[in-house]
Amino acid sequence: MRKTAVYAFGGNALQSPVDEGGDASEVLARVMSDVIDLLEMDWSVVITHGNGPQVGHLLAMDDQQTQGLDSWVAATQGMIGHELSMHLQAILERRRRPERTAVLLTRVEVDKNDEAFAWPTKPVGPVLSSQTVMTADWDIAETVHGPRRVVASPLPIRIMELDVIQQLV
């Protein structure tokens, strides 16, 4: 029986630092090389990722708040999953490996009465300018890098697609 590794990284890991001048594709290519190394050692690999910065960027573009946070989370999961899958599948094919990729959006059930909704703490999106801080109608908190928009981060009750994840693994 093959061992299974869970390769997890945050949404910030999917962005190139500004001073490096790279793009997300270059970052993904580097990350995927680690995954291929695990596959070549005969491990099964499950990749999971964060998306805080990406969600924040989409929220910032949605001035009228036309979409709920869950919609932007799903949109970024799809975008990131697509990019990861494309990069990984290309490397697998170049190395003539038999594995195939699958992307799964994951929904989490939370308690609507969770106190986290009253005290948003999860930073999303970029560091905000002082002008944005003064005019934005959002919850904002000071972080190590500067002020950022924050959203609620309630405790998960269950992963709604857990049975599908178990079937894939």
Regions found by a protein language model. Name each.
Residues N51-G52, V108:
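An acidic- and aromatic-residue-enriched active-site/binding cleft used to recognize and process polar
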